[in-house]
């Protein structure tokens, strides 16, 4: 191989390793067998959630994972691999890919990484069942509001009782 090609591949490894380090979550899938139309729809959905989706050679992915400190992730880079990176939302790539896989038998989740820790296929699928960030925040808000609401109702009940007594 020429030195120019080797340098280009080394640069690609560095770029992918940086994406892996910066990613909140990484999901690796086997997208072999998807039609062009399905792939286009999937990419559009991922882009809409600010998830980067790339098909990258396994040798590049293995070297990048090693460089990013995710050596155990190398075991999923077998056969055709596509990788979804999300820097913001941990749940988005897993949720979108899992929902898409329900309708497209050709798409198979292989594994990934969550906030720098390697995750198995089962862990990625479990992550996909969680509500998105907005859903989790609304749940938290309702839990925080419940005690205040209960106190307000108790005060109102006491006030109503005093009005009735007077």
UniProtKB/Swiss-Prot annotation:
GO CC annotation, single: large ribosomal subunit
Subunit and interaction comment: Part of the ribosomal stalk of the 50S ribosomal subunit. The N-terminus interacts with L11 and the large rRNA to form the base of the stalk. The C-terminus forms an elongated spine to which L12 dimers bind in a sequential fashion forming a multimeric L10(L12)X complex.
Gene name tied to this protein: rplJ
Keyword Translocase: no
A Pfam family of this chain: Ribosomal_L10
UniProt entry keywords in alphabetical sequence: Ribonucleoprotein, Ribosomal protein, RNA-binding, rRNA-binding
Function, as annotated: Forms part of the ribosomal stalk, playing a central role in the interaction of the ribosome with GTP-bound translation factors.
RNA-binding recorded as keyword: yes
Family: Belongs to the universal ribosomal protein uL10 family.
Entry-linked HAMAP family: Ribosomal_uL10
GO molecular function terms attached to this record: large ribosomal subunit rRNA binding; structural constituent of ribosome
Domain of life, per lineage: Bacteria
Family matches, as InterPro entries: Ribosomal_uL10 (IPR001790), Ribosomal_uL10-like_sf (IPR043141), Ribosomal_uL10_bac (IPR022973), Ribosomal_uL10_bac_type (IPR047865), Ribosomal_uL10_CS_bac (IPR002363)
Protein name: Large ribosomal subunit protein uL10
GO biological process, alphabetically ordered: translation
């Amino acid at each position: 191989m020429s030195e120019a090609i080797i340098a280009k591949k080394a640069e690609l490894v560095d770029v992918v390793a940086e994406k892996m380090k910066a990613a909140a979550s990484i999901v690796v899938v086997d997208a072999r067998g998807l039609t062009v139309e399905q792939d286009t729809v999937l990419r559009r959905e991922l882009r809409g959630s600010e998830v980067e989706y790339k098909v990258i050679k396994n040798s590049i992915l293995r070297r990048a994972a090693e460089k990013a400190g995710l050596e155990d992730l190398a075991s999923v880079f077998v056969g055709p691999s596509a990788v979804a990176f999300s820097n913001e939302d941990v749940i988005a790539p897993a949720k979108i890919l899992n929902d898409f896989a329900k309708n497209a038998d050709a798409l198979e989740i292989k594994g990934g990484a969550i906030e720098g820790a390697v995750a198995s296929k089962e862990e990625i699928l479990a992550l996909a069942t969680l509500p998105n960030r907005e859903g989790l925040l609304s749940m938290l808000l309702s839990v925080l509001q419940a005690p205040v609401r209960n106190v307000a109702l108790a005060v109102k009940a006491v006030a109503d009782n005093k009005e009735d007594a007077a």
